Design a protein with these regions (language model features):
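Periplasmic polypeptide-binding modules associated with outer-membrane biogenesis and secretion
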Residues: 1-179
Length: 181
C-alpha cells in the first residue's frame, strides 16, 4: 500500500490542489495503472482527461513533466515522490493551415480554438480537432496539429489537413405497376 505521497517542484499549483486532483492518497493500494492515468500518462487524446499533466498543459505549461519515484518501505508499503518540472508557460505565436484546396482558410479559422496570442491549452487543441472533424471536409484520422516551440515561451501550431471527397452524386430509380419512378 501507499504510505505517503510527497510533491516536489510544484510552485504553480499548491500541494493540496495537486493531491486532491490526483485522488490517490496514503493508505490506498498501490496501482501503477491508476497512478499513471491520474498523472496523465497513456492515452493522450482523451478530451475528458482530468490528469495532473492536463492541468499544467491547459494553462500553458506545454513542456511540464511529472516523474513519479517509488521508495520501497518494508515488505508491503511504499512512499511516492512526485517530481514536477513545470517549465515556462507557452503562448501561441502563429497558427497555420495547410492542405486545404477547396475550403477557404477563413471557414477553417472560424473553427479554431487555438488562436495567436493566447496561452497554449491542450483542451482547446482537442476541441479544435473535434470541430475540424465535424466539418466533414477533412480526413478525421489525419487531423493532428504540428506543434513547434519557436522560443522558450512561444509555440507555432500548424494544422496540416487532408481533404476528403465530400461531393456526392446519387442516382436512384425503381418501378412498380408498369410505371417507372
Amino acid at each position: 500500500y501507499i504510505r505517503g505521497i510527497k510533491w516536489i517542484g510544484n510552485s504553480v499549483y499548491p500541494t493540496d490542489q495537486l493531491q486532491r486532483m490526483f485522488g490517490v492518497k496514503a493508505g490506498d493500494t498501490y496501482d501503477k495503472k491508476t497512478i499513471n492515468k491520474r498523472l496523465g500518462y497513456g492515452k493522450e487524446d482523451n478530451p475528458e482527461d482530468m490528469s495532473i499533466k492536463s492541468l499544467y498543459q491547459n494553462n500553458g505549461y506545454l513542456m511540464s513533466q511529472i516523474e513519479p519515484a517509488e521508495i520501497i518501505i518494508g515488505a508491503d508499503s511504499i512512499d511516492m515522490e512526485m517530481k514536477i518540472f513545470e517549465g515556462k508557460q507557452f503562448s501561441i505565436n502563429n497558427v497555420g493551415i495547410s492542405g486545404n484546396l477547396r475550403v477557404n482558410d477563413e471557414v477553417i479559422r472560424r473553427e479554431l480554438y487555438t488562436l495567436p496570442g493566447e496561452l497554449y491549452n491542450r483542451a482547446l487543441l482537442m476541441q479544435t480537432i473535434r470541430q475540424l472533424a465535424g466539418m466533414g471536409h477533412f480526413d478525421q484520422e489525419k487531423i493532428m496539429p504540428d506543434i513547434k516551440p519557436v522560443s522558450n515561451e512561444l509555440v507555432d501550431i500548424n494544422w496540416p489537413l487532408e481533404e476528403q471527397a465530400s461531393d456526392q452524386f446519387n442516382v436512384a430509380g425503381g418501378w412498380g405497376s408498369g410505371t417507372f419512378v
